[in-house]
Design a protein with these regions (language model features):
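Extreme N-terminal, non-catalytic leader segments
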Residues: 1-22, 63, 270-273
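Residue-level signature of catalytic and energy-coupling elements of molecular machines
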Residues: 9, 20, 46, 54, ...
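Walker A/P-loop phosphate-binding motif and the immediately C-terminal alpha-helix
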Residues: 11-49, 174
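Short glycine/serine/threonine-rich phosphate/pyrophosphate-binding segments
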Residues: 22-30, 51-55, 136-144, 166-169
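Phosphate-binding loop that captures ATP/GTP phosphates
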Residues: 41-103, 114
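Phosphate-binding/switch loop-helix module in NTP-utilizing enzymes
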Residues: 97-150
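Conserved catalytic-core segment of NTP-binding enzymes
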Residues: 130-235
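C-terminal boundary of histidine-terminating zinc-finger modules
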Residues: 238-249
Length: 278
């Protein structure tokens, strides 16, 4: 039986990583904004059940906490989607963090967590989109497997950093996506370097891995290298991402190049760029 295709959505992509702390969600938010600014109709879904934070990165206020753990059952499918996505900076977005309080704990593990995420994803009124980007939880277990075995994905971007440990964990993710038949579009190297504030030359601040096999030997294309800069972290902390506040910066240009590569890989035809959202 084939996996479920979400009506009205041309391409469903996943942003994934083998471990946490590589900046996967930062990449997902700014990539989505770069695609939107190229005229692509984009939705963004936070699939991290236990640590959802896309809504905070977009500056969307969280719900008040109940102060109690939430044991949420997976209900029967609704007759039709009914959850309206929130729009911010031109993106349609939904996060499980918008459905519970900002400090509430969700008591759902294993396949149950995966089914809950799939159910929420299908219940959102997405409308017509060129791309829906899912920000996956880190790792290679559940709920990732349930998501990949339920929803049809057109490709995945693997987010890593230059160090050995990150690349080793990336190789484990490769096995998961190969097993489930999801095409790997390529690798995004985050925190790759920084630009010297005096001369503008790139400086590699982390020891580069000697195990580039995770990218080269496996024949995966490196789709982009994202530099370090305080404006990236500041934008995420304040809910005003870099691509919105400083769209012409060198760091934003790296995301624009990444967006162009993703569009090329999946055959997107960007439309007329939108007016900038205030």
């Amino acid at each position: 039986m084939s996996n479920l295709r979400i009506p009205g959505i041309a391409h469903v992509l996943a942003g994934a990583s083998g471990k946490g702390g590589v900046g996967k969600t930062t990449v997902a938010v700014n990539l989505a904004l770069a695609l939107h600014q190229d005229g692509v109709r984009v939705g963004l879904f936070d699939a991290d059940l236990h640590g959802p934070n896309i809504q905070l990165m977009l500056g969307i206020p969280p719900k008040s906490s109940t102060g109690k753990p939430l044991n949420i059952p997976v209900v029967r499918s609704a007759p039709r989607p009914y959850i309206p996505p929130l729009e911010r900076f031109g993106l349609k977005s939904m996060s499980l963090g918008l459905l519970v309080g900002d400090t509430d704990t969700i008591l759902a593990d294993g396949p149950l967590a995966g089914r809950m995420i799939c159910r929420t994803l299908q219940d959102v009124v997405w409308g017509e989109l060129d791309v829906l980007l899912l920000d996956f939880p880190p790792g290679t277990g559940e709920p990732q497997r349930t998501l990949l075995n339920t929803i049809h994905f057109d490709g995945v971007l693997l987010v890593t950093t230059p160090q050995d440990l990150s690349l080793m964990d990336t190789s484990r993710s490769v096995g998961l996506f190969r097993q489930t038949g999801v095409p790997i579009l390529g690798v995004v190297e985050n925190m790759s370097f920084l630009y010297c504030p005096h001369c503008g030359e790139p400086i590699e601040v982390f020891a580069r891995s000697q195990r580039e096999w995770a990218i080269t030997d496996a024949a995966f294309e490196q789709l982009g290298r994202i530099p370090l800069h305080m404006s990236l972290s500041r934008g995420i902390e304040t809910g005003h991402p870099l691509l919105h506040t400083i769209p012409d910066s060198p760091e934003a240009l790296a995301f624009r190049r990444l967006a162009a590569e993703v569009s090329r890989k999946v055959g997107l035809s960007p439309g007329k760029p939108p007016r900038r959202d205030r």
